[in-house]
Amino acid sequence: MEALRQRIEAAFEARAEITPTTVEPSVRADVEKVIAMLDTGEARVAEKIDGQWHVHQWLKKAVLLSFRIFDNQVIDGAETKYFDKVPMKFADYDEARFRKEAIRVVPPAAVRKGSFIGKNTVLMPSYVNLGAYVDEGTMVDTWATVGSCAQIGKNVHLSGGVGIGGVLEPLQAGPTIIEDNCFIGARSEVVEGVIVEEGSVISMGVYIGQSTRIYDRETGEVHYGRVPAGSVVVAGNLPSKCGTYSLYAAIIVKKVDEKTRGKVGINELLRIVD
């Protein structure tokens, strides 16, 4: 793995000279190997080690290199065709493979090759970009978007129209991360490498980026780039120092309790694949 990392790093430094026609076969093979590893979950752009998230930047660089290496191709899709550099993840799947991997994919969900989809996940008509990692038991609801290299935990619900930001454009240092057992409400956006920690509930219509103030009304503490574990967050405003206007903020109104869990709990009936 270390030798592969070093080769990817070296190729990335020379990326300006790389095109689909000039790329060395060995570089193409290395990038294809990384994409395959991301696709199966053998590798992931970020992982939690000893309670801290670590980003493997070289894997992200391989994803970026793929856009320099692979040429556009015609892609079949339902009643139409597409033209893109990245093939679709399920292009060569048959019924046996869908059943083996225990996932449901509702048309016209679009999932790019190089993204990982865990068992007992449900993909409604949604979009998952390459490099993303969607863990087991998660629901990606209608018109939700999982951006490039985003990390989605186990038993997460991404409600209708949710946007989870990617890292490729604009280029971000770290991926957006939604930890296990989180609920993201309809039309909310979490971007710019923000981490929503385990068990949190984001109400609908909440927008969180790195510069968004995340205000805990119980303690008065303000967080940036991180929603503490078990938080219930709604959209709100905080007054300016001069008191003449207010600016948008995400407000932590309480910690998740049994009443909250009852409202946003996972419906196991919807996760049955067999």
From Swiss-Prot:
Q: Which GO terms of the cellular component aspect does the record hold?
A: cytoplasm
Q: Which GO terms describe its biological process?
A: diaminopimelate biosynthetic process; lysine biosynthetic process via diaminopimelate
Q: In which pathway does it act?
A: Amino-acid biosynthesis; L-lysine biosynthesis via DAP pathway; LL-2,6-diaminopimelate from (S)-tetrahydrodipicolinate (succinylase route): step 1/3
Query: Does this UniProt record's set of keywords contain Acyltransferase?
Result: yes
- Enzyme Commission numbers on file: 2.3.1.117
Q: Name the reaction it catalyses.
A: (S)-2,3,4,5-tetrahydrodipicolinate + succinyl-CoA + H2O = (S)-2-succinylamino-6-oxoheptanedioate + CoA
* Residues binding substrate, per UniProt: 104, 141
Share what the entry says about its subunit structure, partners included. Homotrimer.
Which family is annotated? Belongs to the transferase hexapeptide repeat family.
Question: What is this protein identified as?
Answer: 2,3,4,5-tetrahydropyridine-2,6-dicarboxylate N-succinyltransferase
Protein's gene = dapD
